[in-house]
Amino acid sequence: MKMRAPAYPLITVDPYFSVWSTSNKLYESDIKTWDSRTCFLIGKAEIDGNGYIFMGSAKDMDLPPMTQTDVTVNSFSTTYIFEAAGVRLTADFFTPVLPIDLDMLSRPASYLKITADALDDTRHTVNVTVYASQDFCVERKLQNCVLTERLELSNGISAMKMGGVEQAVLGSSGDDRGIDWGYFFLACNNGTVQNKEMADRVFLQSVSPLDTADNNTATVVFAYDDIYSVKYFGEPLRAYWKRDGKTTEKIIEEAFSKYDNFKSRCDEFDINLCKSAADAGGEKYAQLLRLSVRQIMAACKLVVKNNGEILYIT
């Protein structure tokens, strides 16, 4: 059963690292944070040399959109399907915050898997670019307030990180505030990640040269290192995933190597949840519960105190 969501979840890690689409079509509006601030996340596909937009309004690019033909939401994924110029493009947003596994629940990484397939018998070139702006890591909009850095990761992963020049960790709080500390990461396993300036912002962009034959898939990972996550009665606390000294770079490498495992476990959880919910309240209730899982998981943060006590804070 199809349900029109009030906002479609894209990245749903925690309150500071979650973005949503508030329109029926992914390209009809800018991507937003939970409190409706614009967080520019743009997707462009060049099909046989002709450019199209599939994510974000991207008004400055003056490109036509692909046609969105479908969108589905489950407990961990939102999947869009687009068509243009003989190509079907599938964009699957997946955040593996599995509630029965604290290590997975705490991981600060989210995926966008792009797949290009031909709608005809022609081999098409499909160059996919994903742009992520400095809005992910700073509230200020001046270009000179952020720095970018290229990372050296294993297995041919291209990655960069971006963060504010000033790092006032836990320096602000309250509703209607974005994070103004820590580092945003963008990584890709089939392409290159670069930095780019557009208008009044700095972007990280992944560029994946695909085709509709034997090179039709690319996976992009979005990740975040918030350094410290919360101040709990005056005590700065780190995220649970950091308890043994793991780095964000390691999280990203594991995100690619363990993707299939994470996906299968989350799919199994979703199937069981959906069946139980449908048995209890019908298909409409099951779909509503799926969307609720996305909203709930994006509203919480798993941290650990210095004495080892685990806190799940919303």
Provide a role label for each language-model segment.
Residues 83-104:
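Low-complexity, acidic Ser/Thr/Pro/Gly-rich terminal tails and inter-domain linkers that flank the onset
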Residues 51, 86-90, 123-125:
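Short, mixed charged/polar active-site loops
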Residues 56-62, 93-98, 133-134:
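A short, sequence-level motif marking secondary-structure junctions
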